[in-house]
Amino acid sequence: SKLLEQKGPSDYAFTLDGNEQFLDANQFRLHWNELTNNLPQSFLDRLLFVEQPFHRDIALTKSIGEALGDWDNAPPIIIDESDGDVESLPKAISLGYKGTSHKNCKGVFKGIINRATINSLNRQSGEQEFLMSGEDLANIGPIANHQDLVVQAALGNESVERNGHHYFNGLSVFDQVIQENML
C-alpha cells in the first residue's frame, strides 16, 4: 500500500478476487481481519469489492447470509462463479452481497437482467450501493474480445478484468492470414 500511495496515480482503485478459497465465512473474516489489520484506511477506501471469496457450494447459503449480516464493516463482496442463473443475483443481494460480475459466457441477456436489477436497487437506495464488475474470462481477438468489450460498455462496466491473454499465446490459435490481417 505504501508504494501505491507514494508512486501510484492519485485516483487508483483495486479489487481482490477470492477465487472461491473459503469454505467457511468465519475463515474469510479472520483472513480479512489479518490481511487488513495494518493497512491504512486510505488504502482500504480504494477497494471496490472482493469477488467470490466463498466456494460456490456454500456462497448462496443461509449461513453465509447470516455471517455477512453479522459482520459490521465487511468489505463489499460480489458473486461470480455462483452467478449461474437469473435468480442468483437477487438471492445474493438478499444474503448481503453487493453485486455480481458479468462475463459473456454467463449469458448476455442475463447480464442485461442483472444490470437492470442493480440499477433498480441503486435507484431505490438512492446510492451506488450495488455494482457489477466485468471480466473477459478467456476471450481473445479478433472477434470474441471485441464483442465482449462492446457488451461490457453497453452494460456500463467501466473497469473490466482482462484474463484472456493469460490462457492464450497472442493470436497463435489462428491461422497466419488472420494473424497478419490483425496486425
Where are these regions (language model features)?
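Flexible C-terminal active-site loop/helix
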Residues: Q124-L183
